């Protein structure tokens, strides 16, 4: 297919990637997450690459636990692998506000979320991300942790809203910020359908690096994830 998504991730050694997955990622993966991953592949084929990889899921789970987060927000849910990962990591009284414009994809994962007994933790908002964030800002909501994995060209606008929603000391995580490694390559070598997000993410990464309101760490896991700790 002309628009087939390249194999996700910035780690180019297939042998090393397989070692990481088979040694620590797959053995620790929750059974319902495994089932959800398989269901996503069955329904979406190559597009299942939009889901976070297993090792990144472990990273997010540990981060939420280390932070003792209780109130989180996720923009961009797809079938809910990262959403279920977070729900399993939160305490019984933890809550997630999940936003996505594609309710059909979310419902693929809802079956497994219910099986895990964590559906009571999730408030799903069927909406465009920016519209939903603006409403949450108006409602003066507050979160400990945010995970953004939606329209990459909207990351700058997501960031401004999330700085109003995530408490001082909280974490905002942006996924895919290294975009298959294309951010470090000349545009001529990048597939045409990947160039728009590449350009948007290059500019976004520059803005984050210069933003005095956050402390930034870019993590080379999955397709690249950038952590922003709110300072002011």
UniProtKB/Swiss-Prot annotation:
Name listed for the protein in its UniProt record: Putative caffeoyl-CoA O-methyltransferase At1g67980
Binding-site residues for a divalent metal cation, renumbered to this chain: 149, 175-176
Entry binding sites for substrate: 8, 149
One GO term (biological process): methylation
EC supergroup of this enzyme: transferase
Cofactor note: Binds 1 divalent metal cation per subunit.
GO CC term (a single one): cytosol
Organism, as annotated: Arabidopsis thaliana
């Amino acid at each position: 297919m002309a628009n087939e998504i390249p194999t996700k991730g910035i780690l180019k050694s297939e042998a090393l990637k397989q070692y990481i997955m088979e040694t620590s990622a797959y053995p620790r993966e929750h059974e319902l997450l495994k089932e959800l991953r398989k269901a996503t592949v069955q329904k979406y084929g190559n597009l299942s690459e939009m889901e976070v990889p297993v090792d990144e899921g472990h990273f997010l789970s540990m981060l939420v636990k280390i932070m003792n987060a209780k109130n989180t927000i996720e923009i961009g849910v797809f079938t809910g692998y990262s959403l279920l990962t977070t729900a399993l990591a939160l305490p019984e009284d933890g809550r997630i506000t999940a936003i996505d414009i594609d309710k059909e994809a979310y419902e693929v994962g809802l079956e497994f979320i219910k099986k895990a007994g964590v559906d009571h933790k999730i408030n799903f908002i069927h909406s465009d991300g920016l519209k939903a964030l603006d409403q949450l800002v108006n409602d003066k909501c507050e979160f400990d942790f945010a995970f953004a994995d939606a329209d990459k060209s909207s990351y700058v606008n997501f960031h401004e809203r999330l700085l109003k929603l995530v408490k001082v000391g909280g974490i905002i995580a942006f996924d895919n910020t290294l975009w298959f490694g294309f951010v470090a390559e000349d545009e001529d070598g990048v597939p045409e359908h990947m160039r728009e997000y590449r350009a948007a993410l290059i500019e976004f990464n520059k803005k984050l690096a210069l933003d005095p309101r956050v402390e930034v760490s870019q993590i080379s896991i999955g397709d690249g994830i950038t952590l922003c700790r709110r300072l002011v």
